[in-house]
């Protein structure tokens, strides 16, 4: 629906809100013909669907960026991801633990979910299409940071899962989380991203 961005730019509401409302209405009208939206009833399908949505949204943010990577060009984005986002995760987790009486696992999950910027909902203040030189540093920083921080937040989601598993006595450890979910997956994500970026 190519007319949707033009409409939402006039009324000041993200088109994601309209798609969400459309999904609610469609399920309300045709619920007997559609699968259950409850995650526990369709775990595998919902897992892969949410992964696909994250990949598409991050790809959409990535293809808008035409500034070559360097520490100088990306310094603000990297500071937002590696400093500001980590502080937001810690702050949200601390508030959840001390003020909402959540467990450590639930508090960490709250921080990991709330801290990242959504690349879809933030699109109204992001960069215009590639090769247009009018974008400000602020708009570039918001776009690049929105793409980077989702990937950097995933290890903390797994940290919350690890704490929950440890509380239930399951066979896992913080060392495994750090070596696999934090070090290995981040490095492989960067390597695959560089290779695909060069190839395409």
What are the residue ranges of the model-derived segments?
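Transmembrane helical cores of multi-pass secondary ion antiporters/exchangers
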Residues: 1-200
């Amino acid at each position: 629906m190519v007319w949707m961005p033009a409409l939402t730019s006039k009324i000041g509401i993200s088109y994601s809100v309209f798609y969400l409302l459309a999904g609610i209405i469609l399920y309300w009208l045709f619920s007997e013909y559609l699968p259950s939206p409850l995650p526990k009833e369709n775990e595998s399908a919902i897992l892969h669907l949410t992964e696909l949505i994250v990949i598409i949204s991050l790809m959409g943010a990535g293809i808008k960026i035409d500034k070559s990577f360097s520490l100088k060009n990306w310094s603000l984005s990297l500071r937002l991801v590696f400093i500001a986002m980590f502080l937001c995760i810690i702050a949200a987790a601390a508030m959840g633990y001390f003020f909402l009486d959540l467990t450590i696992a639930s508090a960490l999950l709250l921080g990991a979910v709330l801290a990242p910027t959504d690349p879809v909902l933030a699109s109204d203040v992001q960069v215009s299409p590639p090769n247009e030189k009018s974008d400000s540093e602020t708009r570039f920083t918001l776009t690049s940071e929105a793409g980077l921080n989702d990937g950097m937040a995933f290890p903390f989601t797994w940290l919350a899962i690890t704490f929950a598993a440890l509380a239930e006595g399951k066979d896992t450890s913080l060392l495994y989380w750090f070596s696999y979910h934090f070090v290995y997956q981040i490095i492989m994500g960067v390597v695959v991203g560089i290779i695909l970026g060069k190839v395409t």
